[in-house]
Swiss-Prot record:
The keyword Lipoprotein applies. It comes from Arabidopsis thaliana (Mouse-ear cress). PANTHER family: COPPER TRANSPORT PROTEIN FAMILY-RELATED, HEAVY METAL-ASSOCIATED ISOPRENYLATED PLANT PROTEIN 39. It holds the Pfam family HMA. Belongs to the HIPP family. The gene is HIPP39. This is Heavy metal-associated isoprenylated plant protein 39.
Amino acid sequence: MKKIVLKLDLHDDRAKQKALKTVSTLPGIDSIAMDMKEKKLTVIGTVDPVNVVSKLRKYWPMTDIVLVGPAKEPEKEKKEEPKKEGGGEPPKKEGEAPKEEGKKEGEAPKKEEEKKEGGDKKEGEKKDQPQAQPQPVVPPPDHVLELVKAYKAYNPHLTTYYYAQSIEENPNACVIC
């Protein structure tokens, strides 16, 4: 699920309805919302943002992507609540002083275990490195991208040329009544 925010140059409700209808034809859309004051269209779903923009640029060449992100924003309130419940240090008891001393004594064995685990991790990382070497994708140069955008925005209406026959040259045009 993605949340896509697009900026459109719409002027009236008719253009708004046309934009909503155009976007709604794409598969994978859960909800569509339009903010006419800010001229922003919000699309939520699994649809590809590039497809949405290319579909809208046929009618509105100045369509731009403002934001592409997750559909639901992370909830900060839930994260803050556990901190408040366990907030602060627990009350000190008489039995805690020996535990802290025990921790100091037990730190040396933990460091040795970490070194052993660290050695295993390094070996694991060495094994993972040859497998995880994706080939870098080279993006096209910016000037080519601008030309492609200009070409897609230019959508001329094709006119059909008809041959106009002369009546004088057509033998079937002569009729005797």
